[in-house]
Every structure is written in structure tokens, then in C-alpha cells.
Amino acid sequence: MKLTYILLIAVVGVAIEAKSVKKSKAHHKKKRHETLADNYKLNRIKDSDCKDVADDCKAFGKLEKDDENSCFNNPDKARNECPVSCKLCVSKRSKKQSDYMGGYDLQPQQCSQQSCYETPQWSVQNCAVTCQLCQPGVSSGPVDQDVRCPFWGQYGYCSQQQQQQQTDGYISNNCPFSCNTYGSAQPAQQPYPYPIEALSPYQPNAMPTPPQGVTPAPLPPYFQQQGYGYPQQPQPTQPVQPGQTQAPTAAQSTPAPVQTTPASGKTTTEAAEETTTEAAAEGAETTAAPAATQAPAAAGQEGQQPAAGGQEPQEAQEQEGQQPGTEPAQSDKSNKKKHKKDKAQKKSKSHKKQH
């Protein structure tokens, strides 16, 4: 009985201790790390207050977003000490940017699809081509002043009459390039939600939501090569300088095989087969001595008949006379031997008569 009471007390004590530990953990729960996405409306720093005051702002602003020491993960320092380097100014322009008319990106290495909506004001001034706010290479053309302009133009919000009345012409006034480029788009059935608020740096869900069942207008030709999204500025082709050798193309470096044809009109394979056949025939004639002796006479009698392989008789005889061990050479040797034999027989007969 006492053992039961002791076990019951122990169980109750363990339960109370576990509950107290749980409350303690909940009370001392670590606060979530704050980023520039939190309280994003504070990221729009006025031009009069937008200046860097820390010495390491340039290096601080170049850190990647995922870096724990970046602007995104250190919002207090980004807003208070380095708003210029962290791209939080409303419309901060440098002297170089003040003359900017469009047609190219001022900071192409920092421009990307992601930057168009993470840092919208900075991207309008520095990434007009990447964000599709102007025509590439046309510096005197119109330039959009809102990164949402391509979306509004493709989905027909430029030509929506009710849209112009409700928004006081915000879209048409701020999107001259997109409204002109996508002028053939079907008008939107409903106006864009009003009021249209200005985007803030690192604002979550800054990309507008496409209306259901609506097909956007096609991209212009100078953006189609890069696919849907934000194209990169095409690199111009470098001309070949005098004295330099241009790298060969695939067609130039690999010439097509050429089949050689002899003068007789036959292919190389057929000519080789005929040469082999003629060599075998000549070898057979060399071993046959009686046939070799009669060959010159036969060749003389049949001088008008064409030689094998389509050659003329004279050409065949010339070829036979040039090769060593042929029939004329063998007949000369046999004639000399016969002449010596006859001479020896005459000498022996004359010697017998003298005796």
C-alpha cells in the first residue's frame, strides 16, 4: 500500500516538473530574426535622408541576400546607416544616372528578374532593359517608371477606360513604353485594384496576380529571344581586327569528304581492283615460259585488238615494255641461249672434220 502511494507521488511530481519546464521554454522562446521584408514600408527612405554614414556601406551592400551579414538580414543598419548602398532610396540618382534616358542597363551585373521587384525604385533607374521598361539600344525612346508596367500592358490595363478614370491615368502616365508596345492587347475586363500603392524595397508578393482566363499579349521580337521574363542585354558581335584570324565555324573546320575519280572516269576502288587483276595476270605470264616466248608474235598479229581494261594496243605494249621480267626480255634470253648452242655445235662439227 505504501509502495503504491510512493509511486503515485512520484508520477505527480514528474508531471508538475515537465509542465513547468514547458512554460519556461515558451516564456523564453527565441524571437524570430527580423529582415527587411518585415515592416517593408519603412524601407522607402526619403531623398533628403538617404545617405550612407558607415565606412563599410559599399561592401555591406554587395553581400548576397542569403548572407547573414547582408542588408536584407540586418534591417536596422540598412535603414539607418547604409540606405544608399542597400538600395532603399525613393529616387536617389547619381550624376551619371541623372542623364540616363534608357536603352541599356546602368548596372547590368546587379540586374536580374529578382532585383526588379526586390528593389523596384533602384531597378527603374538602373535596370530598364532587364525589367523590360524600354526598348534595348534606343536611348531616346520612352521609359516606364514602374516595374509593374510590363504586366499592366500585357494584360490590357492601359486601354481600360474605367481604369483611367479611377486611377487618374496612373498607368498610362507612368507606362509610356509598355502601353505603346502592347497597344493591341485585349482591354482588361476589370480595372486594376485602386488605389495603386508604390512598391517598397523587399515588399512580399510585389508581383501582381494575373487575372484568370486571360492570355497576356505576346512579347515584342527583341524580348522573345530571351523567353518570358526579364531578358539580358544581348552582347554585340566583335568585328575581326586586321591581322587577326577568325575562329573557324563548325562547317569550315570539318570539310566534306571528296571522292577522287581517275582520268578514265572510274572510281578509286574500281581502279585499284583493275590494278590488282593486272598484277596477278602478269605474275602468271612470268611463270609460263613457252607462252612468254609466243607473246610478242601474238601481240604483233593482234595489234588492232584493244587491250584489257579499255586501253589502246600501243599503250598496252608500252606498259609491258616498261615492267621488269616481261615477255620481250624473256624471249631475248632464250634466243641468246639458242644462238650460243648453235655456235657451239658448229665449232664441234668443224673440229671433227679437221681430225
From Swiss-Prot:
Where primarily located? Answer: other
Q: Where is the composition biased (Pro residues)?
A: 207-221
What is the taxonomic lineage of the source species? Eukaryota, Metazoa, Cnidaria, Anthozoa, Hexacorallia
Q: Which organism is it from?
A: Nematostella vectensis (Starlet sea anemone)
Per the record, the similarity remark reads: Belongs to the NEP3 family.
User: How is this protein annotated for GO cellular component?
Assistant: extracellular region; nematocyst
Q: What is this protein called?
A: Nematocyst expressed protein 3
Q: What is the annotated tissue distribution of the protein whose record heads this document?
A: Nematocytes. In late planulae, transcripts are found throughout the ectoderm in nematocytes, with high concentration of expressing cells in the oral pole. In primary polyps, is expressed in nematocytes in the body wall and physa ectoderm and in the upper and lower pharynx.
What keywords appear on the UniProt entry? Cleavage on pair of basic residues, Disulfide bond, Nematocyst, Neurotoxin, Secreted, Signal, Toxin
The region called Disordered is annotated at 202-355
Bias (Basic residues) ranges: 335-355
Those residues forming the propeptide, per the database entry, are 92-355
- ShKT domain mapped to chain residues: 50-89, 107-134, 140-182
